[in-house]
Swiss-Prot record:
Belongs to the universal ribosomal protein uS19 family. It comes from the Bacteria. One of its GO terms (cellular component) is cytoplasm. PANTHER family: RIBOSOMAL PROTEIN S19P FAMILY MEMBER, SMALL RIBOSOMAL SUBUNIT PROTEIN US19M. This is Small ribosomal subunit protein uS19. GO terms for biological process: ribosomal small subunit assembly; translation. It holds the Pfam family Ribosomal_S19. Protein S19 forms a complex with S13 that binds strongly to the 16S ribosomal RNA. HAMAP family: Ribosomal_uS19 (MF_00531). Gene3D superfamilies: 30s Ribosomal Protein S19, Chain A. Keywords: Ribonucleoprotein, Ribosomal protein, RNA-binding, rRNA-binding.
Length: 91
C-alpha cells in the first residue's frame, strides 16, 4: 500500500541536509547513506548516492526516471548465483 499523498514523501533529515549542501556547492562526490527507506526527490537528480546494501556502499547515479522510488530499490541486498546446473545434461 503506497504512502498517503497528504503526508508527502519520506526522507531522512540527515540525508536531506547532505543533498542540499551538495547541490549548493555543486559537489559531485558520492553521498554515503544507510537510509534505504528514503524516497528520491527531484533535487537529487544528477547526484551519486552510495547506498548501503548490508555489506558495502553501492553507488547509485540518480536520473529523472528514479524520482519517486526509494533508494533501496537500486542497491540489491542479495546476490543471485543462478540455479544449480542439471547433472544429467553434463553427461
Amino acid at each position: 500500500m503506497p504512502r498517503s499523498l497528504k503526508k508527502g514523501p519520506f526522507i531522512d533529515l540527515h540525508l536531506l541536509k547532505k543533498v542540499e549542501t551538495a547541490v549548493e556547492k555543486s559537489d559531485r562526490k558520492p553521498i554515503k547513506t544507510w537510509s534505504r527507506r528514503s524516497m528520491i526527490l527531484p533535487n537529487m537528480v544528477g547526484l551519486t548516492i552510495a547506498v548501503h546494501n548490508g555489506r558495502q556502499h553501492v553507488p547509485v547515479h540518480v536520473s529523472e526516471e528514479m524520482v519517486g522510488h526509494k533508494l533501496g530499490e537500486f542497491a540489491a541486498t542479495r546476490t543471485y548465483r543462478g540455479h544449480a546446473a542439471d547433472k544429467k545434461a553434463k553427461r
